[in-house]
């Protein structure tokens, strides 16, 4: 079905992002592709679905064929009829506001009649328990719900191959269980799967083979049996996540401290409200915020920072009320979709921009001591780049980075800010073990007596490393009259 022989991929005059790739994939097979962030996983997927050639001006050497035809020369609409894609950022999939219309949109573009569309929808709902997502506003979905909708759309397209780029990166364990249940059913229907992934625990029973990419090359290849025989120490040396499902063991939330949410009421999706009362947080701690997809975690962060106006709120610091404006000025936030937080033409410029924002507040006698400040900033920026493994990327455009590299860059810009309250929304989504541990180390270094850090995450292994206490937001989600069951 898919044949790749001695294939290399380059963009412009830069170094190849893929080198001498040779692999094959048959109908009903599952190939897992893993490796450090920036190792070429997304580039391989973009080569297979044709985006590297048709949209990114990539230049290929060697052969990449699907059912005997060269993907480089096939029109993009022909590729789309055979190969479906699930991207790291599910927002790039959507063309409609309504979720049901979005699912139908794929089939409408293929020219299917109404009866065939109905049959496919019925078949979909037998595989995917996603009735609760139908008829919803896409913009009201959580990141994980959007990803599930993307996978469902790919199934409806009726393609022979589905390529997935970090499909579990924003999913909670319940949503991963849905994905884990659905993928074998796709295999049974003869659909081939190529999955680029860091979380491996839910794929061990599904995979037929696994390849490990390193700097754009296939460094190692394993059958399922060979991969399962590797020790945890070997996996750690390779920078891979554990095969075992992680379990969170951190202290429960103690509800004490200087920052208090005396009352907070936020409508966050159809018929539901997030309600907190007398919830306190202490300086010098890192709070993990957990809960299933769609329970209001991102809404809580936006309300806490002052970016979202709740229906009702009173937040105090040592007993004194903090207005929304005050919270904005004292907060730094890394959002789930970091693409909306990157503005400049290079990694280094992005960090300098964050530093200049801090300088607006750091004045001496009404003036900024520019030379000394710039030298200090350059040292701080270099330290951050080294700590996050981005030193070699400092001249690159932020939009050319991998998803994990963008996450680390956004986190670095956040840490350069002069803030008391730091909020991180899924900071390790789509991130390998090595870089996850880098971020955990860096966040623990930020624990100071004048700072509180909040981390929303489904990454249990990361929370195990970094969180001092955890708040389960499921406790505070309240359904109003008429809410869906």
Enumerate the predicted regions with their spans.
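Helix-to-loop junction immediately C-terminal to a conserved catalytic motif
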Residues: 49, 305
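ABC-family nucleotide-binding domains
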Residues: 172, 432
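ABC ATPase C-loop
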Residues: 154-155, 415
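Conserved ABC ATPase "signature" region
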Residues: 115-133, 369-393
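Conserved ABC ATPase signature
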Residues: 137-141, 145, 397-401
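H-loop/switch region of ABC-family ATPase nucleotide-binding domains
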Residues: 197-198, 457-458
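Conserved ABC transporter NBD signature motif
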Residues: 57-69, 313-327
